Design a protein with these regions (language model features):
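C-terminal helix-and-tail extensions that cap enzymatic domains
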Residues: 5-149
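GGW-centered surface loops in extracellular recognition modules
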Residues: 2
Length: 149
């Protein structure tokens, strides 16, 4: 078996790697399930990311960086749906049929830089930049990713 215990047990028992993590969600992650939105369950993924990073901190683990992608993609009313951040993260906006603005390309560049820095160093901030802080109990910081107005 690949997984020998449940996710919650793995975290609380320290059975996960002690590495920095980057995790997040989109503003409309469950937009395809309006009944969940009506019940107020749409924040569960967002809150889960924060709770996970706080659990890591409690165990004395390396930091977790949390993001919240809020860019409502143009072209219809789907909003910032599940996986919509991937076009930005991987610089593949041209593969989407949706209209884009200069702000979309700037956001994509920023996200590619952040993810590249994280893969190289375990920290999404470029040298001399420190705007993306780890999510901690004292400062449950979440980096909001959207086009600049």
């Amino acid at each position: 078996h690949l997984l020998t215990c449940g996710y919650n047990d793995a975290v609380t028992e320290g059975k996960i790697k002690d590495i920095p993590y980057m995790l997040g969600s989109t503003a409309d992650d469950i937009g395809v399930f309006p009944e969940m939105k009506e019940k107020g369950e749409h924040g569960g993924i967002y809150k889960g990311c924060i709770n996970w990073s706080l659990a890591l901190e409690k165990l004395g683990r390396k930091p977790a960086y949390v993001y919240y992608f809020t860019r409502a993609l143009l072209g219809d009313d789907a909003g910032a749906f599940h996986s919509s951040e991937l076009w930005y993260m991987f610089g593949t906006l041209g593969r989407s049929w949706r209209p884009k603005t200069e702000g979309d390309y700037a956001l994509s560049k920023e996200m590619m830089d952040d993810w590249t820095n994280f893969m190289k160093t375990g920290n999404p901030n470029a040298e001399g930049k420190d705007d993306w802080k780890p999510c901690t109990k004292d400062d449950p910081y979440v980096q909001v990713l959207d086009v600049r107005k």
